[in-house]
Amino acid sequence: MAPLVLPSVLIASAYLLSTVSAEPNVAELVGTWSTKSAAVLTGPGFYNPVNDTLLEPTHTGISYSFTEDGYYEEAYYRAVSNPAKPSCVSSIMQWQHGKFVLNADGSLSLSPFSVDGRQLQSAPCTADSATYTRYNQSETLQKYQVYTDPYTKLTRLDLYQFDGTPVNPMFLAYSPALMLPTETLNPTTSATSTSSSKMKRWLGYGDEPEEPTTSEGYLLPLNRNAKHISRGIEQPSLINRIDLDLVWWAGVGLTIFGGAAYLL
């Protein structure tokens, strides 16, 4: 019986190690993940909270970002085909951020900041303009997998929806994550920033920005001077800030003035 003891112990140890290694681990989720084209990325390149606008990427795609302290951000850009009229392709852009929980069973529970989500729907064949609205949708992801893709050799993330339907595979694009501030960016009368101390750390100042006037319960327009929003948003270059029309007319004026001075 003694010779059988060692193999049994080894088998039990191997099983224990495999069980431990299979436990959910937030650290492996940390970073910004994007589908293959990498055209869609979370952060200020997709949603600009200063102007409250969604920025259309060059290609459709999905991006998720996660932090080790339990915050997430997601960006979706999808095309919706029209079988009856193939030339009439609609599009949907969605952006959310908030908090997530990695559950013991490996599932993910995503709870967005309810007032911050944005959705832009465009149907050029049925509407003269796009529809821009607030968007708030909690999510449950049944499971996830992080591994090295055997074909691309890149770190890959597979997410599965609540019913087990796989989301398009994503690959690690940034680590640490490329994200907007992990707090409420567009507070309303019924929702405030996540933490005043956290806000102050972002701002670097002791006072929070004043709230603009309200309209139908929403703060409109957004506080464009709020440093916790504008920080990290790329400012336009000097060339982009120059009024080219003004330069042209100034050139015309100098030419006329020079010609008149020459004749005199």
UniProtKB/Swiss-Prot annotation:
It is found in: Endoplasmic reticulum membrane. GO terms for biological process: 'de novo' protein folding. Residues 1-22 form the signal peptide. Residues 23-243 are lumenal. GO terms for cellular component: endoplasmic reticulum membrane. The keyword Endoplasmic reticulum applies. It is a single-pass type I membrane protein. One of its GO terms (molecular function) is unfolded protein binding. Pfam families: Rot1 (PF10681). The chain crosses the membrane at residues 244-264. Keywords: Endoplasmic reticulum, Glycoprotein, Membrane, Signal, Transmembrane, Transmembrane helix. Glycans are attached at residues 51, 136. Belongs to the ROT1 family. PANTHER family: PROTEIN ROT1. Required for normal levels of the cell wall 1,6-beta-glucan. Involved in a protein folding machinery chaperoning proteins acting in various physiological processes including cell wall synthesis and lysis of autophagic bodies. This is Protein rot1.
